[in-house]
């Protein structure tokens, strides 16, 4: 992933006022997941990072499941905006 993409994400994070919203949390987890994925491409045997990545993926999946139950429209907008695949269970 390109470093400039992370910089633009950081700027968006600072502009966001409601850091407790589900959308913002999913956005932050997605950014962290992408960063860890690019790290693991270089360091395949970094098992601590692999474990952390799995934990963050699970947290994001739980938040997305919650959002899809509460507001399906916001869920669809978020996954299309962040380019995330929809869960198989939904």
Curated annotation (Swiss-Prot):
GO terms for biological process: translation. GO terms for molecular function: structural constituent of ribosome. Keywords: Chloroplast, Plastid, Ribonucleoprotein, Ribosomal protein. Pfam families: Ribosomal_S15. The keyword Ribosomal protein applies. The keyword Chloroplast applies. HAMAP family: Ribosomal_uS15_B. Belongs to the universal ribosomal protein uS15 family. This is Small ribosomal subunit protein uS15c.
